[in-house]
Every structure is written in C-alpha cells, then in structure tokens.
Amino acid sequence: MRVAPSGGPPHHHAMIRATPPKRRLKAGTINVAPSFMRERDLMECGVWPVAGCDEVGRGPLAGPVVAAAVVLDPNHIPKGIDDSKRLTAARREELFEEIVATASFAVACAPIERIDRDNILRASLWALARAVHALPDTPKHVFVDGRDRIDIACACEPVIGGDGLVLSIAAASIVAKVTRDRLMCKLARDCPGYGFETHKGYAVPGHLEALGRLGPSSHHRSFFAPVVAARERHRALLAGASASISETSATVAVEAVI
C-alpha cells in the first residue's frame, strides 16, 4: 500500500458544523449495486488504467480525512463490492483484504493540522489528489465521488453518489473507511477517554459528553462548532475550579495565622 506524504500551503476557513455519521440503508430500501460498466467502456476505448477515488472523514469532530484511490483488476474483481456505508464492519474488513490483494491502490491522509489550517473541503480534495498521485501506475481517467474535481494531471470525472454507482469508487470507499477506522482505534489507545474506537470521531452523544468533560484533545478539529463550544465550556470549568481552589487556599492561610 502506498501512503502519500503531507505538505502544502495554508488556506483560510470558517468554523464548521459537525455532521452525524452516515448510516447504512434500512432493510427494504432499494439497493442498486455499483457496476464496472463505466470503467469497462473506457477500457474498450483504449483508456486504461481507470481509477476510482473516495474519502472518509469529512464530518467527524476528530481524526484525519482518509482518501483512497483504486484501480481494479478487470479479471479479478472481488464479489460483493458496494458503497462502504451499505456494508457491515465485518464485511468491509473482508472486502478490504480482497481488494488490496487484487487491485492497485493507494491511500493518503489529511491530518488534523491540515484540516485546521486549510479547511475541511480543501483538505479532503488534497487527500484525494494525493491518493491518485501515489498510485503505482498513473491513471488515464479518474472517477471521483461527489461534485468536485481534484487537482490531477489526467481526466477527472466527478460522480455524485459515485460510491453507489461506480465499482472502483465503491472499492475506494471500502479501503478508505477501513483504513480510517483502524487509525481511529489507534488514536483511542493513544488518547483514551473519548471513545474514538466506538464512534470514530463523529458527533454522537457519548463523544459530546466526553468533550464537555475532558475538553478537546490534540486530535480534535479546532474550528468545528461543537469543539469550539466544548473548549470554551472546559475553560470556564477550569477557571471556576481554579477560583474555588484559590479561595480555599486563602481561607486556610488566614486560619493558620489566627
């Protein structure tokens, strides 16, 4: 697996509101599986390699954005590839191992420093471009999930809802999701108390409670609104506790000399 390095110039950004974790489709919802049709059409026209790329982690309050780019082997495509949000964690892990064993792929992370410095959108697009650049073979065409183009030398085709339509994007969504989930579990060991291993940094009630109690960690995104609010509340609590300690110390000191 190739991992792209970080770096680049800063950009201005505004405070961001958190988004909840995306959910898998409910039972009974129509689920049209992504297909390899677009990649095959290009391949038959002599355009190859064709990559799909996707990112995970725009919405959470903590942790990096992880992007992946995948070029599937037309002769060895794992069965069951789908939008990562439609799969259980166990099935994602299984497909991850099959994809990385048969496909060409690369991942890139936009760390918390870049997210705070640039803003979440720029950091996400940067990570997507870095993942494509890190592929072992330069693609001639790239499908990217969403509406935004990325800064790459080859043809770039945004596909809204692409992780549910284009098979190589779906594969990239699985690689990015599993990689980020594993990174968040590692952060949970390095920074205990927030429950990163459970919610992966999203703004669920347990995470918000821990933020209010512990204050933000170095892995939290400084300009996301719940983090800003938690930081201010935590400072107020610390200031109140400090004032209480000072008053108690002064009382003890006075009593000691009476």
Curated annotation (Swiss-Prot):
Q: Which cofactor does it need?
A: Mn(2+); Mg(2+)
**Which Pfam families does the protein's record reference?**
RNase_HII
Which top-rank group of organisms is this from? Bacteria
Q: What residue spans carry the Basic residues bias annotation? A: 10-20
What residue ranges carry the coiled-coil annotation? Answer: none
Question: What does it do?
Answer: Endonuclease that specifically degrades the RNA of RNA-DNA hybrids.
The name of this protein is: Ribonuclease HII
Report the source organism. Answer: Nitrobacter winogradskyi (strain ATCC 25391 / DSM 10237 / CIP 104748 / NCIMB 11846 / Nb-255)
